[in-house]
Structure formats: C-alpha cells, structure tokens
Design a protein with these regions (language model features):
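General beta-strand structural signal in soluble alpha/beta enzymes
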Residues: 223-227, 250-255, 298, 321-324, ...
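Cationic, amphipathic, low-complexity segments that mediate targeting or membrane/lipid association
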Residues: 2-5, 11, 21-30, 34-37
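Predominant activation on well-ordered alpha-helical scaffold segments within soluble catalytic domains
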Residues: 68-72, 89, 164, 168-172, ...
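Short, positively charged and aromatic/hydrophobic N-terminal segments
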Residues: 13, 17, 31-34, 38-54, ...
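N-terminal ligand-binding/catalytic initiation module
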Residues: 63-266, 496-506
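Adenosine-phosphate binding glycine-rich loop
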Residues: 65-87, 283, 395-507
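Rossmann-like adenosine-cofactor binding region
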Residues: 327-425, 430
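Glycine-rich phosphate/diphosphate-binding loop of Rossmann-like nucleotide-binding domains
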Residues: 267-371
C-alpha cells in the first residue's frame, strides 16, 4: 500500500490521501516530503484531502479530477480550436486549488462545463462589393460567452487569422477580465476574417454595413455591446454604428469606442496606458514601494505605450525606452512624450526619427529593449515579446516589478521565472483592464444621456484600477498564495462569475 501526494499548481498546499495506509503513517511520510521540499526553498502546508492527485482513488478505482475531466471534454468537443484549448487550460490550471476545494459541489452543478461553453455562438456570411464591382464574401462571428454579471462586452477583431477558435479564446478571457473590473459587464467577442489593410474607405464601409446588417439582430445596449479591437478603429466603429442606427431606428449605446461627436467618452484613448500605471503604482504601494524616482522600461510606441509613458512621468518615474517593429530607443534623460506623439501620431514615422529630437538618445536596430538597467518593466507592444532570456536580463539588472500593458506579452516561461525570483508581476487581464473599464464608463454615460469631463472619467478609472489591484492581491492571499497576482487575478474574476451563475440557477 502507498500514499499519494500532489502539490496543487501555484499553491502552497500539499494534498495527501491515505489510500490503503494508516493516516498517521501517511501524514508522517507527507511531513518528510514537506521537509525535503522546504529545504529547497519551498514552503507548503499539509492538507488532508479526498484527492491525492489528479486521479482520485475511490473504491478501488481511479476517478479523474474534475479539472482534467473538463479539459478533456473541451478538447474532444472542440478539436480544431487549439487557441481555445490553451486559454481554458491556463485558466483552469491556475484555479485548481479553488476548484478542488469545492469539487463535489461544482461537479454536481456541472459548473465548469457551463463556464467553458458559450451561451451563444453566431456565425454568418458577410457579402460586400469591392471597388472593382466584384462581390466578396467573408465570415462573421459573435461569441456571446457569459452574461451572468451583465450584458456581453468585448471587441470586434478584423484580421485574416480570425476563426471561431480564436474568437472563443478571446471571449473566454474577456469574461474574467471584465469581471475583474467590478463593473456589471459580461464577456463576449466577435469579428471577421476581413482585412481592412489596403482597402479603400468605401470598401471598408461596404463590409461594415453588411456585417452590421446581420449582427444587429443579436446586439443591443442592454444585451451585447461590441467595441473596437485589432483592425477595428474609429472609422470602422463609425460605419458600424451608422448602419445599426439606420436599421434599428435607435440611437443607443450599442457600441463603445465611438467618436466624441456621437456618444464617445473622453479619456478612452488614454485609458489603457493610464490604467496600467494606476495599477502598477498601487501594486508597489501594497509592497511598500513608491513609483516616484524609479526608472522604467516600456516597449511599444502605440496608444498604450505613449500614454503609459505620459502617466509614469506624471507620477514621478523616468521612462527611458520606447520601441517599434524595427528597433528601440534608449533615452537616459527620459523619453520626450511630445516628440514620441509627433513621430507616431502625427508623422506616423519610425523611431529612427527620435534622435533628431533628442541628440543624446540612442537608437538600436532589432530587439533589446529589456537589456537596459531599470527598476520596472512594462511590456506594451505585442504578444510574447518578453522571453525567458529577457526576464533573466531584467532580474540581473535589478528589475523588481513587471506589469503587462499588452495582451499576453510575457511568455509562460518568462512569467514563471520572474515569479520564482520574487519579481512583482501583474498579468495583462488585470493590468490592461483600463480600456474595457472605460468602455463600460462610456456605456454608463450613454445610458444617462450625459457626457462626463476628462477628469471625472480619469478619476473613476483610477478607482477601478486600484480596486482591481486589491481584489487580486486579496484573492491570492486568501488561498495562501500572497504575492501571486496571476493566480489572484484569475481567482478574483472566477469567483464573481461563478457566484452569479450559482445565484441565477441552471440557465
């Protein structure tokens, strides 16, 4: 006979079961295992559980853990959707300690099965006529994932890579991101394989009008409120809103990211970058540090990076880097935000131009933005831009905090390394939630037929980001994972959605 042991991922709890073994002997072995692990710098508590591993021993036969059972079902049911598989796996694995504490209850209610299955998946054709008079046909999608805490909310992505699996992956992530804001918004996502690049304004308008002609049947200010995303900017939102109003005869807040002349919100452009700094500042405060006087490396030179740089310098930090697809800039005196805006927003030029404004700066081709000695790193450029080697350089150079401004800019290996080395790490679903939070504030203004000042929106945004920071910190601490903000963000988002689902019954 032997006991089985397992440490739940991202948890200091060490579960054991005494299958066929006296409990006293089993615990003695468990304590020896604990001593061995603690001698290697690990810290655990011993917890007697019904399950010792992912395969539970029940009545002489093994039963798969609920998390693994659901993961297998997701893959079997959605075989051609690897992005969706990955998203579900990453979230459920980080929630294992929470799910296992309530496994019997969740299994009986099929709660995870309901959580990973969208409430509605809409797929439709989008015919439109190009400038040459040729009819083109694209595919449109809207996945309304979960409305337990409010109307579906999530962007519309226009890119050739878009398919149902990607939209489901994005929609699933959006559920937890929106929940974290504390605002009454559910999760959804949509889009099409249409590529607006290289298309004339007339062609983009033709596509958007055709797309909305079908989509308008499923959305509304209190039902589903789409927004912009990759490929969907102010131009596209305008065309979509115009067609909705034309068909429905309603002037309502059915889309966010609108222009200021027809219901948009002030501070929306700045929201993600400003929100990133509000959360970073609060995370440092919780850990007894101050952002004032710190040096910061920021990647990217788009909206998020520009306004993160602006707010960081307002808070007394010094941002010394910026980057684009061709290279990066190091300015030891601090990035000139006005110059950066002129280069990127006005001239739409490359960062090679920056040296004309700041002769003492350095321009470097290719990668390398994370090689600079800084206190704080804020990746704001693109997915998987910060690799394991970059993380090692940051740690070696004394970086003590990383917060994600882009969506998943840090690889899994880099994230794990940073956490192991004690670097404060704020995941994107929390750190870059300022954009969706301000979209929800736009919905509120539209509902009230009011337009708030920039200062009012900014103050509300700051409160939301500070609350997100405390919610993820508190959730991590409740489950014995103090300082693990990745787990904390997932737990905080999960608990709110699950509690709402349970309260509303089997629907």
């Amino acid at each position: 006979m032997q006991a089985e042991f397992r440490r739940a991922k991202n948890s200091p709890q060490f579960f054991f079961s005494n299958a066929g073994m006296e409990e006293g002997n089993c615990r003695e072995v468990a304590e020896n295992c604990k001593k061995n692990l603690c001698s290697r710098g690990k810290s655990f508590t011993i917890v007697k559980g019904q399950s010792a591993g992912r395969n539970q021993v029940l009545g002489g036969r093994k039963r798969m853990s609920y998390v693994d059972e659901v993961l297998e079902k997701v893959v079997a049911k959605n075989p051609a959707e690897p992005e969706f598989h990955q998203a579900v796996k990453e979230v459920l694995e980080s929630l294992r300690v929470v799910i296992e504490a309530n496994e019997d209850k969740y299994r009986k209610e099929a709660l995870l099965e309901r959580l990973v299955e969208p409430e509605r998946q809409i797929k439709f054709r989008v015919p439109w006529v190009d400038d040459a008079g040729q009819v083109q046909v694209n595919t449109g999608y809207r996945v309304q994932f979960n409305s337990a805490i409010g109307p579906y909310k999530g962007g519309l992505r226009l890119h050739p890579s878009v398919n149902l699996g990607i939209i489901k992956f994005l929609g699933f992530e959006q559920v937890f991101k929106n929940s974290l804001t504390g605002l009454p918004i559910g999760g959804g996502k949509g889009g099409s394989d249409f590529d607006p690049k290289g298309k004339s304004d007339r062609e983009v308008m033709a596509f958007c009008q055709s797309f909305m002609t079908e989509l308008c049947k499923y959305i509304g200010a209190d039902t589903d409120v789409p927004a912009g995303d990759i490929g969907t900017g102010a131009r596209e939102i305008g065309y979509l809103f115009g067609q909705y109003k034309r068909i429905k005869g309603l002037y309502e807040g059915v889309l966010t990211g609108k222009g200021l002349t027809y219901g948009g919100s002030l501070a929306r452009t700045e929201a993600t970058g400003y929100g990133l700094l509000y959360l970073t500042e609060e995370m440092l405060k919780i850990n007894g540090k101050d952002i004032k006087g710190k040096t910061v490396a920021i990647s990217g030179s788009g909206n998020v990076a520009i306004y993160a740089t602006e707010k960081a310098q307002e808070l007394g930090a010094k941002v010394v880097t910026a980057s684009d697809s061709t290279g990066w800039v190091y300015d030891p005196e601090g990035i000139d935000v006005a110059a950066l805006k002129e280069i990127k927003e006005v001239n739409r030029a490359r960062l090679t131009e920056y040296k004309k404004y700041r002769p003492n700066s350095e321009y470097h081709e290719g990668r390398g933005v994370w090689s600079v000695k800084v206190d704080i790193a804020l990746p704001c450029a693109t997915q998987n831009e910060l690799h394991l080697e970059d993380a090692k350089m940051l740690v070696e150079n004394g970086c003590f905090a990383v917060a994600e401004g882009a969506n998943m800019p840090t690889t899994l290996e880099a994230t794990e390394y940073l956490q192991e080395k004690g670097v404060l790490f704020a995941p994107g679903k929390a750190a870059n939630a300022g954009g969706v939070a301000t979209s929800a504030l736009e919905m509120s203004q539209n509902s009230e037929r009011l337009s708030w000042t920039f200062e009012e929106v900014d103050a509300r945004l700051k409160r939301i980001m500070v609350n997100i920071c405390h919610n993820m910190a508190d959730a991590a601490e409740r489950y014995g994972m103090a300082g693990n903000y990745v787990a904390g963000a997932n737990i905080a988002g999960f608990e709110k959605v699950v509690n709402a689902m349970e309260a509303q019954g089997i629907v």
